[in-house]
Amino acid sequence: GKRLRGILIVFCLLISNLGSSFPQDKSAPGAVQVHLVITAEAQREDSELPALRQDDVKVKQGKTFLQVTQLIPARGDTAALQLFILIDDTLDSHVGNNLNDIREFISAQPPATLIGIGYMSNAGVNIVQNFTPDHALAAKALRLPRGNTSTMDSPYLSLISLVKGWPQQNVRREVLMVTDGIDRLRGEKPTASQLGPSFGPVYHSMPTMSPDVNSASEISQRYNVIVHSVYAIGVGRAARSSWDLQIGLSGLSKLADETGGECFSLGTSNAVSFKPYLERLQKIFESQYFLVFLATPGKKPGLQRVRISTELANVEIAAPDNVWVSAGK
């Protein structure tokens, strides 16, 4: 909202020269530039990750390879990162044991990282700390989740409300969600239309993946937001249902995979410590690049499916499944 936009004004000035790191290339006739963030990942944890060069990255649309014009490491002058930490207010209070792990993670962030903190409930976000470079201030904003349900608990609708109110800039924009991924609003007790006509007049409470997972994924990809998650169990009957728990985890995994993020979990169990997850997330931040390539626009702006890969040995690239391409002129 207005508070979120206001806190970013000073930061906008600080990073306004970032655009100079993306000089305009001479585009092929009709082609448009697409900017996004990708992550280089080692296939084996014990192996060294080489630095990517521009010609190491391949972007493919259908059977056509698209021209990569720039690959810029997200370090130094281009290290700016806006990281919003979203905590589900339906989480069990036992997650409080892990809050210190998150505080230490926040405090260890480099100066170029802005941190925001919010709690998810009622299909929205209660922002307790707007984006700030003061990491100690952000760490202090963390509190125990309330540990109860509201009338509209959907982590995916909460994410959508955050992303839609997030001013766009040429910096990394990432979210860390701490949640069980269960849509207690529309996923736990599906409507007849979700179940399908074959179920007949008798109601079945079989949970389904939230219909808002796809919407959250598409909106995040539309606005270049990478979504990571740490799985933690909430309260209520849904949190005692193995089916609900598994579907919630599947929704988080799908969302992370499609936006180029990572879903951290120990199956559907609570982790003793978040520290290994957060250390892995830090490695992700340190292995990111700004990628610029030329895409063929359609008659209307929209998401286009692309595949981003590398032929380097033992290296994988995590990237969004789709990119937003503006309309042709």
Name these PLM-found stretches.
Residues 1-4:
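N-terminal secretory signal peptides that target proteins for export/translocation
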